[in-house]
Every structure is written in C-alpha cells, then in structure tokens.
Swiss-Prot record:
PROSITE patterns: HD (PS51831). It comes from Ralstonia nicotianae (strain ATCC BAA-1114 / GMI1000). It comes from the Bacteria. Gene3D superfamilies: Beta Polymerase, domain 2 (3.30.460.10), cca-adding enzyme, domain 2 (1.10.3090.10). It holds the Pfam family PolyA_pol. This is Multifunctional CCA protein.
Amino acid sequence: MTQYAASAGDAIVDPATHGLDVYAVGGAIRDTLLGLPVQDRDYVVVGATPEAMEARGFRTVGKDFPVFLHPRTQAEYALARTERKTAAGYKGFSVYYAPDVTLEDDLVRRDLTINAMAQRVAEDGALVGPVIDPYGGQADLASRTFRHVSEAFVEDPVRILRVARFAARFAEFHVAPETRALMQRMAEAGEVDALVPERVWQELARGLLEARPSRLFAVLRDCGALVRLLPELDRLWGVPQRADYHPEVDTGVHTMMVVDTAAAMDTPLPVRFAALVHDLGKGTTPADILPRHVGHEARGLPMIEDICRRLRVPTDCRDLAIMVAREHGNIHRSDGFDATALVRLLERCDALRKPERFRQALLACEADARGRLGFEQRDYPQPVRLLRALQAAASIDAGAVAKRYADNPAHIKQAVHVARIEAVAQAGL
C-alpha cells in the first residue's frame, strides 16, 4: 500500500489528522495508477473548518483559499471547496469552503478527469479503500485521453497551459475532441490574454523540462493559443528552409525537433529555452530571399528580448538564448576557423569568464545541428575543438600581461587578445 507519511516511523496514528476525513487527490492517484513515481502529493480534508485545522496545529498558508501545513511534516492539506467564475483570468474566482462541501464537489472543479480521482488516507498515512473516480478518470487513463471534467474548464485559462504541459509529459495521450473545442473557444475569446506573465512562463518552463516539449507547443498551436502567447514562435510554421541543410524544410518543424533533441540530451532549462527561440529571426525573412535566411540571427535578437521582458524570463535563460541566437551559425562553422577567429568567437561569447554558460551554448548548438531530419545521430565535433581552444586561451595569465603593460594600459586588452591567439595556435587548433 502506498504510504504518504514522511518516514517509516510515521506509520502510526497521526494526532494532527486523527478523526479527519482526509483524501489523497489529483496527481498522486493518477501517477500511482500509471505505475509512475509520485511527485505531487495533495490532500483534501472534507467536513472540517479552518478553526478546527488550526486547533490541531496546522498553519494557514493559503491566501485565496484555505490551505494548511501539517505541524510536523509540512505537507499541504486543503479544505474541500467549490469555485465560481467572477472575472477574467485565472484569479477571477470566488471560493466557497465549508463542512458541507463534499469530495465530489471538490473533484468536479478540477481540470481533467485523470486529475479528478481520490483515495482515502488512513490515520497511519496509507491509502485505503477503492479509488474514488466519479468522472471517469480511470477509463481516460486507459484510453490515454485528456478530457475535461466539466464545462467549468473554460473558466480558467491556465488549464490550456496545463493540458499542453501534460501532453509534453504524457506524450502518448491525446486531447479529447470536445476538450480541444473548449480550448479553441477559450483562445478565440482571448482568455489567455488575461494570464499573468509569470504563470505563463512557469507552465512553459515546466513543459520544456518534460520528455517531449514539442507536444506542449503542438497542443497550444492546435487550439489557437500559441499565436496569442508566442506569436514570434507561431509564425515559424510554413516558413521554408533550404532542403539540403534542412530536409524537414519547415522552420517550425525544425524548431520542435531541436527542443526535443535538447530534451533527449537531458539539458537544463536555459539550453532548452535557447533551443526553442534560436531561429525566431527566420519568421521575418523577406519572402524574396527564401528559402535562404541571411541575417536571421540578428533579426531574432529583439524578438527574444521582447519575449523575455513580456514573460519575465529568468536572466540565465535570456542571456543564453541571446548568445545562441546570435552565434549558433558561427559555432556551426567553427570547424573551419583559424586561431584568430576562434579567439574572437570565445571572447564574443564571454567564454573565458563564463565557461559553463559557453558549454551550455554548445549543447544548444548540438541540439540544433542534430534536430534535422536524417541528422539525428550525426556527430557534432565542434564542441571538442572549441573547448580545447577555450582551455588554451584560458592558460594566458591576463594579470601577468597587464603588469607588462602597466605603463601603457591602453594596450592591455589587445595584448591579452594576441596572447590568446598565439596560445590557441600553438595548441594546433
């Protein structure tokens, strides 16, 4: 039996929850039924009041609805509640919670049937009794279907992002046609426009970190939400590239192959975001020069900066994305660079001061090179040579050079630059 206690020693009666009607809900039940590790552990308490919870030592943490921290384990327990839409956006709800709210009342407000299941939690922390599944979640798990619980799905635009994120995690699932229709209706009504930027980024970032991030963007694009959230990305579909370099031709298809390749390489979030936006400039290539994309690197930079401002993207993701968009072509071509060109590239990337960020840029470029039809398993030797060049350039003691030019400080920067070139050349690169 699955245990929800903090440790083996918790498999005894818990005085904080003794006598409470407690259920594990949502992702914990879904993942248990799928045979997956349980990541999210949410509890709902039926028939209690805030005062009763506080009297047991629980600490209130919810601002918009009653959520409490267990006095010992710090696990979150929420009172069963219902919600009613009162205004646009994901915060436009009034919440009702009282002892007369049933478990089924609480479950019906949830987004998908596969997240609207529960199981009673015994006083020793074990799950007991049958899975409570009033809305067909187990059947939808079996058919690998994302299906909304009720028409109230349309009241919360975050649910569009959540469905898309779940698609990136559970790539074999599909969106039920009736749920897709609701999502399209929400997008057309502009509901996603009311989302706060931080929440949009939070869901996109979580989706990028899943195994198949391309599925997130496929779902958003299919329902019409992508063009409202990331129009710079949406316009890439249908833009052709040279078939000799890109057998997949379509720039949007290529971009999705790149983010999935970055995911398969188990890269961190900054690399995956850089992979997502590295070719945005191709969406504004003049039609008369297609399928070539001369200057797309520079054209993409202001778009990336605008997205990062708009969605409050973290600095590490923004900085890497800008570097990769600007330099990915040069990194691809670097196998033909001489020592001078190699050092210039390293210095533009600030690789000597931030070598780890440079390594991440190389990962994004490898994902770009391999994210092409027929190139998925091709070797990408550029990082080996560039990292050897970085090691050689880093062997120069800039402080020692500065001392030699103490009387002529204007020449220090150039002298260090020349010394690095000589070191790279002597390394046979």
